[in-house]
Structures are given as C-alpha cells and as structure tokens.
C-alpha cells in the first residue's frame, strides 16, 4: 500500500500538498495508494497509513497534525473505482479548484471514517467541512454488521462498507463533497468543499426526484463522519453550509440563501432527504409535495422496479437493496439503510441543532439499544433545521437512523426486529400498538371507523396522513373556545382548551363517553371508551399531540396510530403484507393493504359513504375520504370519518356554494330511504356524490350497494329512482366536484379492474373546487337527467321521464333496466348516449361492463380518460358505441339464468343496446323469462308483474300471444346488447350501429374501438321511441333483419309489411317471450313445445333426437330493402360480430315434434347447441378468421365449414330430418357452392364462382360424394357473397351466379346426424337476395319459381317449388327442391334423417320471389348441435321451432299452415328471410360466407322464437345464461352477437356442440328440463 501510495504521481502529491497547505506532517498518499485500499485488506505503512479494507472505503490515518483540517472525504468510488486520494486541507485553506468533472471520483487520504477528517478525529470542524465521502452501504449496514468504531481512537476502524451500493453499484458513492476530481489531473483533487460539483448536484437533483438516495446517502458524503466536531456549534456549521448557497454550487438554488443555518440544514437535509426518496430511510423525502413521503418509493427511479421490490420484499425494499432483510430495523425497511449507512457518529453529544438533536435523542431514547450504540460515537451533526426547512426534512433523524447502524450488531438488534426500524423505534410505542389500525383491517373501513372514533374521520387520518399530507387528519383546526354543550369558555391556547375539555368535560363525565360538542356529527353517540372520546375531541380542538419525530417532518396526528403509520413512510417499513396468496406486496399500513386487496384481489368495496343518500362505495378508506371531502365537502369529510357510525348526521350544511350545492338539496337521500336525512346540503352532497352513480345506482333500492356494487355515488336510493329529479336539467352551475366523479368511479369493479383510486380528477377537484364542482354538477345533472329519464325503482314513469314502460323486475331492479334512452342532456355531445349509458343496470350493484361505464358517471371513471363526458369506465367504450346505437333498456338482470339479478353479464346484457327508450323486454316478458328460468332451475317463481295494465294493448297482445294473426306485432325490441345486441332490436330506420354492423355486440374494453359511420349512429330521436312504438323507423335491411322481430311472430301491423324479418340475430328476449306467448296463443292446444322455451324444447329434442322441424322464416318486408342498408356498408369490414346478423336466415317450418322434441328452452339449442351453425352465425357474423375457411375471403367465397357440416354417420335415427322434412332432391351440381367472387347485385347480382382458397368445399365437394363430412362441407355450403352493396341484388331477384356444385350423391348419400347443414344464412340470404325486398311474403304454398340466377358452372338450379308437405316429424323425400338449400347456398341435403339429399337438377334455381319456400325440417335439436365453431356465421334469425310450429313472420304463414305438411316445394324451400335485405344480407354468414353449418332448422325456428338470452348475457359471458334458459338463438347470438363470440358459446351440453364454456347452471339440462318441462309449460301458460 505504502509503495503504491508513494507511487502516486508527483502532480497529485503537489496538488495534495498545495491544497493541504503543504503541511509537512501530512503524509502523502497517492490516490493509487488509496485505490489499492479497495482491494487491500491490509493495514500498511504502519503508523502513517492505517489502511483497512473497507471495501471501497479506505482511510489512511494521517499523523495527527493540529494544523491540518480534518478532511472529510471518503472515496465514493464505484465498485470498480479505486479509492480516491485522501485529501487534506489546512484548516483555513479553501483552495478553489475547478470543480472536478467527476465529483464522485476523488482521492482519499487517511481520515477518520467517522468524520472524514485527517487528524484529530474530532477536531474543530473546518468552516466548510467537506462532505466526507459517503460511507458505502452494503449488506453489513443492513444487517447491522457494519460497525463504526465508536471510539475516537486514532486507528479508526473504517468499516469496509464502502462497496458501491448494492442497488446502485453504478453509483460510485458520489460524494457531495466538492473535493474530488481525481480525473482532472491538472486540477487539484481537492475541490473547495463549498462548491458542490455541478454534475454531482445535477445528479443529486435528478435523484432527488428519482430514486431515493437513502441507500446511497452514506455514499454521498453524508456518511456519519460528516458530523461537525463537538467544537463546532451547529449554527457555525450550518452557517458554513449556508455559505454554500452563495457559492456557485448547484445547491445555491436549493438552499435558501436567507437562512444560513437553515440552508445548511437544508443542504444536509437535501442530501438526506433525497437519499430517503427512494428508500424510506428515516430521512424524509426532500419532496414536500409528496403526500406520503414515499421514501421507499422508487417510483421515480427509472431503473428501480417498485413492483419487483415489493414482490420480493413484502415488508421493505431493503432486500432489493442488499438482498438482506436480516435486520429489518437496521436495513429494515428502506429507510433503515440510512441507519446502516450512517455512522454512529450521529449521536449528538454536542449541541447539534437542538431540534435535530432533540428529535434524534428522542429517537435514540426510543431505540434503547440504538442510543447506546450512538452514544459513544461522536455526533454526526446533521443540520437540524434551525428553521423549519422548506419541506419537512427527515434530514437529521434520517441520518440518525443510521445510528441504528452505528452499532452494527446492536443495530440489527436495535433496529426493531419489529421491522419498525429506526422510525418505528422512534414511534416505538406506537409501533407496538399500531393499535387501532388493524394491520389487515379495513384500516378502519369507512364504516368500521377505527376504534378510535373513526367516525370522526380521524381514523383514516393515519392513512391519509401518510398518503396525503393534506389529509393527514381532519382539517386543520385550531380551536381555543369550548363549544361543549352548555360551556362557552374561551381559552388563549389550544392546549388550554384541550386541558379544559379533558378535565372538565370528559373526565367530568366518567361514566358517559359522549361528545357534547356543538354540532358534533356524532350526535352524541357514545363512545365505547373514554380514550376514544378524548381522541374524538381532537377533531374539534384540532389537537394533534402525535408529532412525527423525524426532524424536518412537521406532521402531527391526533391519533397515535396515524403517526405510526406515518413513521413508516420514513422508515420504509411495510409490515402489512398482502394476505392474498401469491401476492407479496407489502404496505406500511393496513389501509393500503386493504385497498390493494379490495381493488386487486376482490370486487369488494367495503368503504361506504355514509352521507345520507350517498351510496358510493370504495375499495379503500382513502378513496372514500377523498370522495367525501371532495363531493360532500371537507366538513362532510370530517363527519364522514364517522362512516362507521350511524349515518353521520349530515355535516353542517356547507356553504351552499360548496360541493354539496351540486345536489339539489331537496332531493331525497336515496341512500337511506328511511333515513333520508334530507339536509339539503347533505342531499346535495349526495347528489354530488354523483348522481351519475345513480346511473350505476347500485340497486336503487339498496341504499348501500354491496361493496361490489357500483360505488355509485348516487344516493343510496339511486337518484334515478327519483324520476322527478331534475330530469334532464343539467345545471352546470352547481358545484359538483369532479373529484367526486373520479371517486365515484374510483371504486373500480374488479372486473376491470382495477381500479384506479380516485381519479386525478378527484385530486384536481381538491385543487380546483370550482372546477370540480362544475364537473360534479354536470355529473349530477346527468344523473338527474338519467334519473329523470328513467324511473329507477319507480315502476311508474314520472311524467317527465321519457315514456318508457317501466320494467318491473321480479324483484330485479327493473328500474335499473331502464336505460335512459333520451339523450342525456348531460352529455349532449353524446346525444346518442343510449339508455345504456344510463342503464339502470347499475342497479345490479356491480359495475358491469356496461354499467361501469355508466357508473363512471361518464365523467368519473378512473379508466375513462379524465372526465370523458360519457363513460369513464372501460365499458365506456361500450357506452360510446352504445351511444350511437339504440339502447336496449332491457332489464339489466332481466334474465340471467345463472344469476338472475346479479350477473354482471346479465346486467350488461339487459343493459344491452335496446332501443334507446325501449326496454328490450316488457315486464311481462321479463316475468316470463324469469318464470321460465325459475321453472328450469327450480327457483321460486318471479314476482307477478304489477303493471301489466300499463302495457299497451298491442304489447299485451303480442306478449300474451293473443293471436299470431292478430296483426299485432311487438315492436322490434332491441335485443340486449348481444347479437340480439345488434341492430336486431333497432328500429328499422336505424342505421347499423357499429356494434351492429361491426361487432354485433358492444365493444368490450379490450376490443378496439370501432369507428362508427355516421349513418350508423342512431338518430337521437330514435332513441326516444317508446316501447309502444310499434312502427319503428325503417332499419337498413340488414338491421331490420337483425332487429329482433318476433321471428315466428310475424304480424304486419299495417299494410306495410313488417320489417320484422326473421332477423339474422336471434330474437331478443322480448321476442322470445312474445313468440312464446304467441305460440301458446296460436296453438289452441298448447304443446309442451309451446310452453317450453326453445332451448328446452330443442334440448329435449336433442335428447330424444326426435326430428323437430324448424321453420324457415322468410320475412321480407318491402320495407326491408337493400336500400335500407347503407350501401357503403362494408360487410367485409365487419368484425366477427356478424354484420350478417342482419341477414335473416330462412326458417324452415318445423313439424311439431313431441315434447321431447321441444328445444331446450327456446334458445337453448342456440345458446348451448350447435345453433352455432352458420345459421347461428346468421347474424352475419363471420367466423373468427380462424374458424372461417380461408376460402371465404371476407365475402369472397361461400364455404361450407366442415364444422358446420353434419357429423357423418348420424342418421335419421337422430330424428333429424334432412333439409326440409321432406327430403328434397338435389339434382343440380354436385355441390352447391356459391362462390361470391363478386358482390351480389353490385355486379349484376351474380355470385361469381371462385374456388375456395382455404377449403374448396364447393369445387372439391363437387367431385366428392357427399360423405357426411362431405355433407358437412357440401351441405350448408353458404353463399359467400362479396360484400353486398345495398343495391347489389336486384330486388327482383337478379340472377345470382351461383356456382352450385353439389355432388348429388353427396347430398343424397349422406345424412348427417340429423343435423342439417343448411346454412340458413346462405339460404336466407340468397333467397333474400332473390327476393330482396321484392319478394313478397306469400303463403308458404306458393309454387312460383324464381330464377335465382344462373348457377355459375352448374346449370341453374331450379328450385322446384313443388308443394312440400312439411309434416311434423315427417321425413319425406318429397321432392323438395333444395331450393332452400340453394337459396341458402346450402346444398340441399336430403333429409338427414336417413334420407339422402337427392341431387336437384342444376336447372335454374327458381324461386318465385313472392314465394318463400318454407322448408320444414324436423331436424332434431340434437342435430342442431352444430359445430358452432364450424359455422362461419350464424344467421341471427334462424328458423326457430316454436311449439313445433313454424311461423313465417315475413311470410305471415300461420303455424297451422306450415303444419299443413304439404307446402309447395317452394314452400318447402327454405324461406328466404329478409329477402328485402341487401345482398350483403344474403351473405349473412359472413356476408360473403355462407358457411354451411348444420342448420338446425328447428333451432332456426326456435331462434325466431328464441329468447335472446345472448343479448341478456354480456359479451362472452353467455354461459352464465346458459343455465337453463338458453335458447338456441342465444347460442347463435353468442356466436354472432358477441364480437367475442366468434364461436357461439354454448353452455348447453349438446353433444355436437363444442362449446368451451359450459354453463354451471345448466348442469344436466336434459334431466332438469325434463323434470321442469311441465313446470315450464305451466309458467309459460301463466305468462
């Protein structure tokens, strides 16, 4: 070492000598010599150089020279750097050297590691004691092994801790000390101490905001050795430090030049504070703005991964720092690093800053062992702020923590194993108690307020204090006058008041712990213990006896537990570890942990706003407090603290101008109905809570929605319930705080999850109350509007509300069902905000996807961008989409098989996009659905509907099925959002909504937002259409088709043909209900089929495998012309949700099947079964690309998807009938594959045959005998037209150039499992195209032939429209032209029931336009189990078997007619539905794709009747609906309605249906349904 030391360059020596003042006694030590010390463990140059390896720190013991100043500098070298030369300075000399470019590189001279000075270890400090090089921190510090030699003996034991910080190996211990510039050879290594090197300062500054330097603080020259010598007075020292401000050093701007001592303190503090920034060493973060000194928070540190830290170390980040938590107290939590880093020198034996010393001593006293550890070591004078530093500076104490470290071993022990660490030690007693705040407990949940009068709100203080300094505790109050009841004494000081209260009042009433303070929100509710009252009184007096002991930190708390929590912010201790398995996050307080757990691991929102009428719930108390404070006002916030208490009496009315004003004072507090403490301000506050929440209104009825409920701020009784509430008024003037909005949404449903705590808005709200008020006011207004729009609970719509028939849920919150259809004036911009936006769905108490958007109150959703006027939550995206589309106001929970009322999905579904003001379901329908569900599940029957009388006669008729022929048609209710969801329930005039055309389902948050074409948005006016409006505006044909028309319930209300064409989309629940009723009505002899839901029937059929004919519905209304559909609509562009939904699929008339044949609840097959076939897809949804044969480009080719194909080998035994009950012969091309190279109609309405690229089913099938697989391919080959323009097909049925190639033998040769592969879509569409609006609904028996077009390669297939008897269960091979198939683009597969399809002549397919061939097929439900996946698309309207009767809505065929067994073949031919629809509709499957999926015609028929559970079900969560009420249509809906559902989800256990999801509720549907069949029937009858 010595040799190396002497080997230093002459220049360095000279520099050293010069800077030292050339003191002869100074030992020359070369930098290198020192550098070697890093590697050397030896003490060399005995006498002169005491060199002890201390990893990076080498100090050479200078010969004591009085003349020499102690040079405080330790090499802060990076791990790879060598120790710098030790610098000496003569006491008086301050050589001004150029600032070293590398401040952290410096030379190290022998020095006392504790003070860094060369000579007397505790020599009077130099005026500008250079900051000694930081003592490196390493595991030893953390583990308490790092040990400073407490004695001042010359041979200081330099702890060998100078290794670079484990966490910051890259940071050479950057010394703050200005002295160093080893790199600048020309420059003296000794920089004047005062000039802090700019680079270094810059670095520090960056660190200040970024990673805490606490770990590094020691390395920074903050090492314990910095302490001035005892001889130096703190003031002098500070003064010296302060001088720095005058220096050019970067600190100049940091340190207040005004206060020298302060400056010095700040300087030190700055250093330490910054250090603490990252690791919560006791040092307080320099950052004053931080609500909670997240000293531990590495958030700012780019390189530091807080998550990782937390994950790796439940209690602290220290482990990350040194991989050791051995002494959590020592290294303990982040902050404990400081202890390790700081030398014992910290003990203030001398008059260091009194404050810091005092604090420190307190800490030491608390840290009993620590005190001893420090006691002997020379004090490190951390500049105690002589004046309050600009920000609380944990500074000295922070540094003091190192004291713990000081006694290495003792430190470990010292640092409380409790992991409280120094800070905890400071708050040791507190630490032990932490009493009130249960580590895990909700941290007194708002309701639970901590033992200590949480009600006061102080309970949360601790949490707040840490998090939000402003919130530390109740508003700062400094009361000097006694307002105790009957006492008016006044005092000069708060202390006197407190003393008075405690002695005269509290103790005077020993037996009674009641706060009698005037206006106390406790309302004299007694406390359980005196101490609680004492603590409570602090709220009134403002007393905060518990002060943070960290120097520079001025925080004080009225509750000790809050202080303890706060202290953790300094120490970084995180004793509260997430209890969730596998989650290692640790928190400093139970509150944070509870928040984390509630938000991250559950949907629970235990913190309920207790303000009367406010139903907001939060996952964490802080959010609740924030809500209360921002929305209800600071006073409310304080009172709110009472949250645990009985509803606190409304806080004294705040200024009317205050936040509360946003609420209309008069509004009843909806939260506690009985309790409505209508204090106007309280009410207003509640309103402020965000009536928006009302929108979400948990259940308006429920005053406090379950934690999972929308944390709707709206009064517990959702404001909406008060229809009368300001209606649409949107007084922006009210001061609602926006913050509240965020708060409202703040409690995110776990679903999303996540929820950000109160949004920034809330924060801003605090900052800008006026703005927040405005926002809040807007929110409230919107809510009011929404409320006004829809009676929440009030079954009777308030007069001012838009006329919406009240949904009377059986107990469901029907009112929620109402979506405000009216444009919320609130969001005028969102004129289209559908009821969905306001959907009462929220009443479900859960933020369902849709609801959440609403619950966000548009503005508040955390997720939502800022205050997006519409919906904040992720669902807002849905809402946004929804805005354009008619809202389905269906009952949120109207029908959720699994959870009738609760399911989020159901709520969403119910929320579905119904018509803006129309409920998808009438109460009756709801009732019926519920009844069915109850029957299926064995649950209690729903509550009778009280307001049937409210229904219009027509509606009643429709619902009751007073006569299919009555001519009464239910308005096409918009299905809940699902496929049904799509335009299905829209008015005909409405353009496709984006979700309709594009996704067919509301876009989920995860789904990219789809732009909506202008024409797609529903005119606002439409939104207001009342449920009673039976003549909805014309929808684009596609939409019309999609619109849920009672598919089997076709009544043309007026001469105008109903546009109720069997929509490709499955019927909505309403339709299903109506159909069900109609079916019963239509059939005098109600069959079980009639009574049972389609799903049930189909299920039964599938179980029995008895053929259950499906009815082809071809409802083509003149109105539904292609023209209606936006011609520019690019179906190809449509997402998986099928645009094709628009396209109705032909329904085949089904002969009645035995009860067993009945579908399992109408929709069941569709929901659970392979309804999935293209017919399922019929909504026009294209298969997911994966599913779709590539052969179908979008719309390019019709391809029969193999999965659509029927299973081979299934014979008629399955009871499946071939296409049409009567086998239809197909004489034409071997395969009927329609290749739509060209859009129909657009190019002459011809499909151009194109080879399938992916699977050339058509071409190859042509050659292939139809094996069942072939049938699978060939049959049901759908026509895929290129996207069809509205005009593409000529209504007169321009020639479609179908490339029909079906191997006759294939067709005839194989019967699929009774599953018909017909692609309804293809059928419906082709026929539709042919009929394309021109086709008139004509009796099924019409024999006219219509030339569909020339078959491309093949001769035209003439669809012979011979009459075909569709006998129930009849499986004739009657020559039924596979016109249906042809039309559908399916190869007509002869009856699958064992009958081979007979090849039809390729002659021109002719189908008389006016005439839809009604092909009855008694394919069994089992057969229906088509591969949903296989289906490229499901037609939204598939033929549905209803009661074994087929109704051709469009045709207007009566069931009896169809039953008549003999229809002309044309009748037998699949009816083209929605022929009027655009060509694109023809392509319903994927518009282009006609995938032949096994069309269970019965499913189609059923589908017409089917309840659109899918709509009810939220996207993707269809399975829940599957429980028993699933209807095939649902499955279909699933497939097409939900964008998610590229493949229909079938929960039902249909054998062929490969549904990944099975509905738990469904269980064994067959047995259940069988047992419940009668009950269902009964219920249906009752309905």
Swiss-Prot record:
What processing steps or modifications follow its translation?
Phosphorylated by DYRK2 (in vitro). Phosphorylated on multiple sites by protein kinase A (PKA) and phosphorylation by PKA primes further phosphorylation by CK1 and GSK3. Phosphorylation is essential for its proteolytic processing. Transcriptional repressor GLI3R, a C-terminally truncated form, is generated from the full-length GLI3 protein (GLI3FL/GLI3-190) through proteolytic processing. This process requires PKA-primed phosphorylation of GLI3, ubiquitination of GLI3 and the presence of BTRC. GLI3FL is complexed with SUFU in the cytoplasm and is maintained in a neutral state. Without the Hh signal, the SUFU-GLI3 complex is recruited to cilia, leading to the efficient processing of GLI3FL into GLI3R.
Residue ranges with Low complexity bias? 403-421, 703-726, 863-880, 1166-1175
Task: Quote the cellular component terms of the Gene Ontology held in the record.
Answer: axoneme; cilium; cytoplasm; GLI-SUFU complex; nuclear speck; nucleolus; nucleoplasm; nucleus
**Where mainly located?**
nucleus
> Where does this protein have compositionally biased stretches of type Basic and acidic residues?
461-474, 632-648, 684-699
Compartments where found: Nucleus; Cytoplasm; Cell projection, Cilium
Cross-link annotation Glycyl lysine isopeptide (Lys-Gly) (interchain with G-Cter in ubiquitin), location: 773, 779, 784, 800
Quote the protein name from its UniProt record: Transcriptional activator GLI3
Protein purpose: Has a dual function as a transcriptional activator and a repressor of the sonic hedgehog (Shh) pathway, and plays a role in limb development. The full-length GLI3 form (GLI3FL) after phosphorylation and nuclear translocation, acts as an activator (GLI3A) while GLI3R, its C-terminally truncated form, acts as a repressor. A proper balance between the GLI3 activator and the repressor GLI3R, rather than the repressor gradient itself or the activator/repressor ratio gradient, specifies limb digit number and identity.
Q: Which UniProt keywords apply?
A: Acetylation, Activator, Cell projection, Cilium, Cytoplasm, DNA-binding, Isopeptide bond, Metal-binding, Methylation, Nucleus, Phosphoprotein, Repeat, Repressor, Transcription, Transcription regulation, Ubl conjugation, Zinc, Zinc-finger
UniProt gene name:
Gli3
Query: Per the record's keyword annotation, is Calcium included, yes or no?
Result: no
Tell me the segments the record calls region Mediates interaction with DZIP1.
745-845
Q: Cross-link Glycyl lysine isopeptide (Lys-Gly) (interchain with G-Cter in SUMO2) maps to which residues of the chain?
A: 438, 462, 779
Q: What organism is the protein native to? A: Mus musculus
Q: Which residues carry this modification: N-acetylmethionine?
A: 1
Q: Where is this region: Disordered?
A: 1-78, 368-475, 620-728, 809-828, 863-918, 1164-1189
Single Gene Ontology MF annotation: histone deacetylase binding
One Gene Ontology term of the biological-process aspect is: limb morphogenesis
Modification Omega-N-methylarginine occurs at: 175
Is this entry keyworded Ribosomal protein? no
Zinc finger spans (C2H2-type) are 480-505, 513-540, 546-570, 576-601, 607-632
Pfam families per record: zf-C2H2, zf-C2H2_15
Taxonomic lineage of the native organism: Eukaryota, Metazoa, Chordata, Craniata, Vertebrata
Q: Which domain of life is it from?
A: Eukaryota
């Amino acid at each position: 070492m010595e040799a190396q030391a002497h080997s230093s360059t002459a220049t360095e020596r000279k520099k050293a000598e010069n800077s030292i003042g050339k003191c002869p006694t100074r030992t020359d030590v070369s930098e290198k010599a020192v550098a070697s010390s890093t590697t050397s463990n030896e003490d060399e140059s005995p006498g002169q150089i005491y060199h002890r390896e201390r990893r990076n720190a080498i100090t050479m013991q200078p010969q004591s020279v009085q003349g020499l100043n102690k040079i405080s500098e330790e090499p802060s070298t990076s791990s790879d750097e060598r120790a710098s030369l030790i610098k000496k300075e003569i006491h008086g000399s301050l050589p001004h050297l150029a600032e070293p470019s590398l401040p952290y590189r410096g030379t190290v001279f022998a020095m006392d590691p504790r003070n860094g000075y060369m000579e007397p270890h505790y020599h009077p400090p130099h005026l500008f004691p250079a900051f000694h090089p930081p003592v490196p921190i390493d595991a030893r510090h953390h583990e308490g092994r790092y040990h400073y030699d407490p004695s001042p003996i010359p041979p200081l034991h330099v702890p060998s801790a100078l290794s670079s910080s484990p966490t910051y190996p890259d940071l050479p211990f950057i010394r703050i000390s200005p002295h160093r510039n080893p790199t600048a050879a020309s420059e003296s290594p000794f920089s004047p101490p005062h000039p802090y090197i700019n680079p270094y300062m810059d670095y520090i500054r960056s660190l200040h905001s970024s990673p805490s330097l606490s770990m590094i603080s020691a390395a920074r020259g903050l090492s314990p050795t910095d302490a001035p010598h005892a001889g130096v007075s703190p003031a002098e020292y500070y003064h010296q430090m302060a001088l720095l401000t005058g220096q050019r050093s970067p600190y100049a701007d940091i340190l207040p030049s005004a206060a020298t001592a302060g400056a010095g303190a700040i300087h030190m503090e700055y250093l330490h504070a910054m250090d603490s920034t990252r690791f919560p060493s006791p040092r307080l973060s320099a950052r004053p703005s931080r609500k909670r000194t997240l000293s531990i928070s590495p958030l700012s540190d780019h390189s530091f991964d807080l998550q990782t830290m937390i994950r790796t170390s439940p209690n602290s980040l220290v482990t990350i720092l040194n991989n050791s938590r051995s002494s959590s107290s020592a290294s303990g939590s982040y902050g404990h690093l400081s202890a390790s880093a700081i030398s014992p020198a910290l003990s203030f034996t001398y008059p260091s800053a009194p404050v810091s010393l005092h604090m420190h001593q307190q800490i030491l006293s608390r840290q009993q062992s620590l005190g001893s550890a420090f006691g002997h070591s020379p004090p490190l004078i951390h500049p105690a702020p002589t004046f309050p530093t600009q920000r609380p500076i944990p500074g000295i104490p922070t540094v003091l923590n190192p004291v713990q470290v000081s006694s290495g071993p003792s430190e470990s022990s010292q640092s409380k194993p409790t992991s409280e660490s120094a800070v905890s030690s400071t708050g040791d007693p507190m630490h032990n108690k932490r009493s009130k705040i249960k580590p895990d407990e909700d941290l007194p949940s708002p309701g639970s307020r901590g033992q200590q009068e949480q009600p006061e709100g102080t309970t949360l203080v601790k949490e707040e204090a840490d998090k939000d300094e402003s919130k530390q505790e109740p508003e700062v109050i400094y009361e000097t006058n006694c307002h105790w009841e009957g006492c008016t004494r006044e005092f000069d000081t708060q202390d006197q008041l407190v003393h008075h209260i405690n002695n005269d009042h509290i103790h005077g009433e020993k037996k009674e712990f009641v706060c009698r303070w005037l206006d106390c929100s406790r309302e004299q509710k007694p406390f359980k213990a005196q101490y609680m009252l004492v603590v409570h009184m602090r709220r009134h007096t403002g007393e905060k006896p518990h002060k943070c002991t960290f120097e520079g930190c001025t925080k004080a708390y009225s509750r000790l537990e809050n202080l303890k929590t706060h202290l953790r912010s300094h120490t970084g201790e995180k004793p509260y570890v997430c209890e969730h398995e596998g989650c290692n996050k640790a928190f400093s307080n139970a509150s944070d942990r509870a928040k984390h757990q509630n938000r991250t691991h559950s949907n629970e929102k235990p913190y309920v706003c207790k303000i009367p009428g406010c139903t907001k719930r939060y996952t964490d108390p802080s959010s609740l407090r924030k809500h209360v404070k921002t929305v209800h006002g600071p006073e409310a916030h304080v009172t709110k603290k009472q949250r645990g208490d009985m509803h606190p009496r409304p806080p004294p009315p705040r200024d009317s101008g205050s936040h509360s004003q946003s609420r209309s004072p008069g509004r009843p507090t909806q939260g506690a109905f009985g309790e409505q403490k209508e204090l106007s301000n309280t009410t207003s506050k509640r309103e402020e809570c965000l009536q928006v929440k009302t929108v979400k209104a948990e259940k308006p009825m429920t005053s406090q929605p379950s934690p999972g409920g929308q944390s709707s701020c709206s009064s517990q009784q959702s404001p909406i319930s008060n229809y009368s509430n300001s209606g649409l008024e949107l007084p922006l003037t009210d001061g609602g705080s926006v913050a509240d909005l965020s708060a409202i949404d703040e409690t995110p449903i776990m679903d999303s999850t996540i929820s950000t705590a109160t949004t920034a808005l809330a924060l801003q709200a605090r900052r800008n109350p006026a703005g927040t008020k405005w926002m809040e006011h807007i929110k409230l207004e919107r809510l009011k509007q929404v409320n006004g729009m829809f009676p929440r609970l009030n079954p009777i719509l308030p007069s001012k509300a838009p006329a919406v028939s009240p949904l009377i849920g059986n107990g469901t919150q029907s009112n929620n069902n109402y979506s405000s259809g009216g444009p919320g004036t609130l969001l005028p911009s969102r004129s289209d905000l559908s009821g969905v936006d306001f959907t009462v769905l929220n009443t479900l108490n859960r933020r369902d996807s849709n609801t959440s958007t609403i619950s966000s109150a548009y503005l508040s959703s955390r997720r939502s961008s800022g205050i997006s006027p519409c919906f904040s939550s992720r669902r807002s995206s849905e809402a946004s989409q929804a805005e354009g589309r008619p809202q389905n106001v269906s009952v949120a929970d109207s029908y959720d098989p699994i959870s009738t009322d609760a399911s989020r999905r159901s709520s969403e579904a119910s929320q579905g996009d119904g018509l803006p003001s129309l409920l998808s379901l009438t109460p009756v329908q709801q009732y019926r659905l519920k009844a069915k569900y109850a029957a299926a599940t064995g649950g209690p029957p729903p509550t009778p509907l009280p307001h049937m009388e409210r229904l219009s006669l027509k509606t009643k008729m429709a619902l009751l099925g007073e006569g299919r022929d009555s001519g009464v048609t239910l308005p096409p209710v918009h299905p809940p959002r699902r496929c049904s969801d799509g335009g299905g329930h829209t008015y005909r005039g409405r353009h496709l909504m984006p979700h309709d055309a594009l996704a067919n389902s509301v876009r989920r948050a995860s789904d990219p937002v789809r732009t909506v074409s202008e024409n797609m948005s529903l005119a606002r006016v439409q939104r207001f259409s009342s449920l009673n409006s039976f003549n909805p505006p014309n929808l684009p044909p596609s939409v019309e088709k999609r619109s849920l028309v009672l598919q089997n319930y076709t009544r043309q209300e007026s001469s105008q043909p109903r546009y109720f064409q069997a929509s490709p989309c499955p019927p909505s629940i309403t339709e299903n209900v109506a159909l069900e009723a109609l079916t019963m009505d239509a059939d005098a002899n109600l069959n079980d089929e009639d009574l049972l839901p389609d799903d049930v029937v189909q299920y039964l059929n599938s179980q029995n495998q008895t053929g259950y004919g499906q009815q082809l519905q071809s409802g083509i209304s003149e109105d539904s012309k292609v023209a209606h559909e936006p011609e520019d609509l690019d179906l190809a562009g449509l997402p998986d949700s099928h645009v094709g939904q628009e396209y109705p699929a032909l329904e085949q008339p089904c002969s009645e099947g035995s009860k067993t044949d009945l579908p399992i609840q109408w929709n069941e097959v569709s929901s659970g079964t392979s309804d999935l076939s293209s017919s399922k897809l019929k909504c026009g949804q294209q298969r997911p690309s994966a599913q779709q044969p590539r052969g179908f480009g979008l719309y390019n080719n019709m391809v029969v998807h193999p999965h659509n194909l029927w299973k081979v080998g299934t014979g008629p035994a399955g009871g499946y009938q071939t296409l049409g009950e009567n086998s239809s012969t197909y004489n034409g091309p071997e395969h009927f594959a329609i290749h739509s190279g060209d859009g129909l109609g657009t190019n002459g309405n011809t499909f151009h045959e194109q080879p399938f690229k992916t699977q050339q089913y058509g071409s190859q099938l042509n050659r292939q005998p139809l094996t069942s697989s072939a049938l699978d391919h060939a049959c049901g080959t759908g026509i895929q037209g290129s996207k069809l323009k509205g005009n593409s097909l000529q209504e007169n049925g321009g020639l479609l150039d179908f490339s029909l190639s079906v191997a006759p033998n294939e067709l005839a040769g194989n019967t699929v499992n009774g599953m018909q592969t017909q692609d309804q879509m293809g059928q419906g569409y082709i026929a539709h195209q042919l009929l394309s609006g021109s086709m008139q609904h004509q009796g099924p028996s019409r024999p006219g032939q219509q030339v569909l077009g020339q078959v491309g390669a093949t001769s035209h297939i003439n669809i012979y429209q011979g009459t075909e008897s569709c006998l129930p269960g009849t499986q004739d091979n009657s020559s039924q032209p596979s016109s249906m198939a042809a039309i559908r683009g399916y190869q007509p597969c002869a009856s699958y029931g064992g009958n081979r399809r007979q090849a039809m002549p390729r002659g021109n397919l002719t189908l008389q336009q006016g005439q839809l061939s009604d092909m009855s097929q008694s394919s069994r439900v089992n057969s229906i189990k088509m591969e949903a996946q296989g289906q490229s698309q499901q037609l939204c309207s598939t033929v549905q078997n209803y009661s074994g009767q087929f109704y051709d809505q469009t045709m207007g065929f009566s069931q009896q007619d169809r039953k008549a067994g003999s229809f002309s073949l044309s009748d037998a031919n699949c009816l083209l539905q929605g022929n009027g629809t655009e060509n694109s509709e023809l392509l319903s499957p994927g518009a282009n794709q006609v995938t032949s999926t096994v069309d269970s015609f019965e499913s189609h028929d059923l589908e017409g009747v089917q309840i659109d559970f899918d709509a009810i079900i939220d996207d993707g969560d269809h399975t829940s609906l599957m429980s028993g009420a699933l209807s095939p249509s649902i499955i279909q809906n699933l497939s097409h309605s939900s964008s998610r559902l590229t493949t229909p989800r079938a929960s039902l256990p249909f054998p062929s249906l490969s549904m990944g999801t099975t509905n738990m509720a469904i269980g064994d549907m067959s047995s259940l349904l069988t047992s419940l069949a009668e009950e269902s029937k009964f219920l249906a009858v009752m309905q």
